[in-house]
């Protein structure tokens, strides 16, 4: 086998739709760093080929005959653990199945939306390639694209010191790839009587954030709901920012409230909802009494927000490399000098409770 610096990322495509198999294969094979080693028409064939060929990565449909994608995923994870990206429909039912798959070991998902319009097809293809490449970095230990300039470490922000013993009144959490499971792990370790409000921004489509919040609400002691415009950030309540738009936090009298913003107003943000915008406006709205937390995810969304909240007197926690599904977002914060504390995932919820509780 070629060394990691030379060999391609080996991908298995599992989907019962011949059209989807063709689309996924054609998108991936256009990239010289990716090789589609095989396709499978259902879960049974997918498991067989996964065990025989040992791909680096699998794209897995959810609804398939003979053996569905989640059952196939569980069998693969039991016999030959492999990184799996689920390809799911943009529906409430599709969202719930996707979260079941993430609980079963899938690292991320790609919303299937290629039939509505040219724009939708383009968006699907771009996200597919981005997520496959992002996963490839952690598998092969190198970028699957020409190396881009490393994050230039800026001057450390001027920090406003907080009085000894003063606790933060709010918590803002940002995540992307691997985030749904990571956020659940963190919130699950925070007690239901936590005295401060929490806002979570995670890169998800509009159809997914509602079901995700409902799911978290059944698994955590805290009350969890999808945020709506005008919602007040309250103690013991977690607001999940809605997908398909950006969210700002604004001062409203003595409280902090949610304001939703169309993506067209901030075209500079690649990721939706923007973690940077949530954290930046949150820090301003609460005058820096904010604990910012960045979990697993590709890219650098959240770094600018964490840098800003540090200048306002806020505190920061960042997930470590060893427990991150994708180390991009945490790495940007650590290399950028805005991480007060770096912890494994299982310790972050407890640390939030200790610092802000």
Curated annotation (Swiss-Prot):
GO cellular component entries: cytoplasm
GO molecular function, one term: protein-glutamine glutaminase activity
PROSITE patterns tied to this protein: CHEB (PS50122), RESPONSE_REGULATORY (PS50110)
Keywords: Chemotaxis, Cytoplasm, Hydrolase, Phosphoprotein
Response regulatory domain: residues covered: 10-127
Domain notes: Contains a C-terminal catalytic domain, and an N-terminal region which modulates catalytic activity.
General function of this protein: Involved in chemotaxis. Part of a chemotaxis signal transduction system that modulates chemotaxis in response to various stimuli. Catalyzes the demethylation of specific methylglutamate residues introduced into the chemoreceptors (methyl-accepting chemotaxis proteins or MCP) by CheR. Also mediates the irreversible deamidation of specific glutamine residues to glutamic acid.
Protein's name according to its UniProt entry: Protein-glutamate methylesterase/protein-glutamine glutaminase 5
Species the sequence originates in: Geobacter metallireducens (strain ATCC 53774 / DSM 7210 / GS-15)
């Amino acid at each position: 086998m070629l060394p990691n610096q030379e060999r391609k990322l080996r991908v298995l495509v599992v989907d019962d739709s011949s059209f989807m198999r063709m689309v996924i294969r054609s998108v991936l094979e256009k990239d010289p760093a990716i090789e589609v080693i095989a396709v499978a028409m259902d879960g049974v064939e997918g498991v067989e080929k996964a065990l025989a060929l040992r791909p680096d990565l699998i794209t897995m449909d959810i609804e398939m005959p003979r053996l569905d994608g989640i059952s196939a995923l569980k069998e693969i994870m039991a016999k030959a653990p492999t990184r799996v990206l689920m390809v799911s429909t943009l529906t409430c039912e599709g969202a719930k199945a996707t979260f079941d798959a993430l609980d079963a070991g899938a690292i991320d998902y790609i919303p299937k939306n290629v039939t509505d319009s040219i724009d939708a097809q383009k968006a699907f293809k771009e996200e597919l390639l981005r997520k496959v490449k992002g996963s490839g970095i952690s598998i092969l230990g190198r970028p699957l694209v020409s190396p881009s300039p490393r994050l230039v470490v800026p001057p450390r922000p001027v920090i406003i010191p907080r009085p000894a013993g003063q606790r933060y009144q709010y918590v803002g959490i940002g995540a992307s790839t691997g985030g749904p499971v990571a956020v659940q792990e963190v919130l699950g370790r925070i007690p239901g009587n936590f005295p401060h409000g929490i806002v979570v921004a995670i890169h998800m489509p509009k159809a997914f954030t509602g079901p995700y919040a409902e799911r978290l609400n059944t698994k955590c002691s805290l009350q969890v709901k999808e945020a709506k415009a005008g919602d007040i950030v309250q103690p013991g309540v977690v607001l999940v920012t809605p997908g398909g738009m950006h969210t700002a936090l604004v001062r409203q009298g003595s409280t902090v409230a949610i304001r939703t913003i169309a993506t067209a107003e901030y075209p500079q943000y690649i990721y939706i909802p923007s973690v940077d915008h949530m954290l930046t406006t949150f820090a301003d709205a609460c005058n820096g009494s904010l604990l910012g937390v960045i979990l697993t995810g590709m890219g650098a969304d959240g770094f600018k927000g964490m840098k800003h909240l540090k200048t306002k007197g806020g505190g920061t926690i960042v997930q470590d490399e060893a427990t991150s599904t994708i180390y991009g977002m945490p790495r940007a914060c650590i290399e950028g000098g805005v991480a007060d504390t770096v912890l494994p995932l299982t310790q972050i919820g407890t640390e939030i409770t200790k610092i802000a509780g």
